[in-house]
Amino acid sequence: MMELTEPEIQRYSRHIILQDVGGKGQLKLKRAKVLLIGAGGLGSPAGLYLAAAGIGTIGLVDGDVVDLSNLQRQIMHSTATLGEPKVESGRKTLSAINPDITVNAYHQLVDADNILSLVSQYDIVLDGSDNFTTRFLVNDACFFAKKTLISASMFRFEGQLTTIKPHQGYPCYRCLYPEPPPAGLVPNCQEAGVLGVLAGTMGILQASEAIKEILGIGETVADKLVIYDALDMKFRKVSRPKDPTCPLCGPNPKIKDLSLDYTVSCTI
């Protein structure tokens, strides 16, 4: 049976003394498997804190390499890893932070052919992608695999976050946005820009929600959309109800598999 070692008890002592965590909770974190879709702006801070928290297995999925323009916000990487696959750069960083965890690196883009095999190996999925088509693909795959999804996005000075778990009766991503917007209608981060530290804020919130889900503590945001405005320093929570006409999780679904045209419009 998996137990905490003496060094682990010392490493996670500030967790263990928390009434809502304790030794049993830390064991839950050790046994947990979390998949990060994207090892970039959101995946970097989320990965760092999940590794430090003692998540036993972390998966990194990204088909991109480290570019100089990434380093303004993607803190899992550095000048020394320019040109390396992001997942390999991230794997080295997370393993250096916590050598007791397992970090799996998948140097590939997610698509309809590989997404189900990836998410099925993990308990919770964090979506840090930078385009709508990937977000819809990840949402749909997690729905069919019955996996909890923590989704975040950012645009210029604003970030959004929600937890998605329709298998527990909550709304899915398509309840909020039934279809992706037309290609080119909404600029991505490469075109519109993004405040570097905003990635840290939203990625850490993703990690926090994932830890809460694993431990079964706190209030879920599965029926809320959290909106953060960095300029005005304001957080808002907007109600996100289930859509009875949702094409995926509604009573009369139109989407029954991953045969749609999920065209990735931007790197993650």
Where are these regions (language model features)?
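Adenine nucleotide-associated cytosolic modules
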Residues: 1-268
